[in-house]
Amino acid sequence: VRVQSLTLVAAGVALLAPAPLPAARPSPPVAVREGNVRAADLLAKVRDCVPVSKGRYRSDARSRAEIPVCGARGAVFWKADMDIDCDGRPGLLCNGRNDPLFSGTTAYQQSDGRYLSAETLPYVVVPTPSGIWDYRVHGIRGGSVVAVIYRDRVEYAVVGDTGPREIIGEASYATAKALGIRPGPHGGGTSSGVTYIAFKNSRVSPIEDHAAAVTVGERLARKFVRGG
């Protein structure tokens, strides 16, 4: 009888023991809303394009050159896709193991001399200056503030890297993640629907200060929406 009682007790304990949890699945990117200027209000100001580029860009190497850079009061803008830049300072996600095309450098560097971190810093990639367009002529440089708009989201980023001369539409892992876009270098990004508004003669220093980019970006976005 004693043995039977012990057996029943052991069975009861087993029933009360917590079941093993299922393996955790990677969580989807979570969009983060920054500032108070609405995406719709910004998009209303960039409906029409007055080209400032001398030609048009491709969204990738195989696509047709159909994307102009447009001028606006106090800004330039383009409407494109978003490819993912996972370059710069290596991290847990952006490194040579995860991305065979990984480059450990960015065109611009932090205040401490290190390259930017695509994982943690929202930044935009602009085309290397060419006969199509030279961003520097329009008051854009490393650290300039860019409002990146996707659906109803606005993310304030900085110009942080340069890319191919004939391709436009690229931003860092952190930018994509903040907008709810798949951020990985493989299968990440989106094929269309992204608007980039780069504010002329703006600059965040140090370039890695994202809070400052949000503050400056929000102020310039409000001014842009008001038409000034």
Task: Name each region found by the language model.
Residues V1-P26:
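Secretory targeting and sorting signals
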Residues E155-P164:
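Short beta-strand-centered aromatic/proline hotspots
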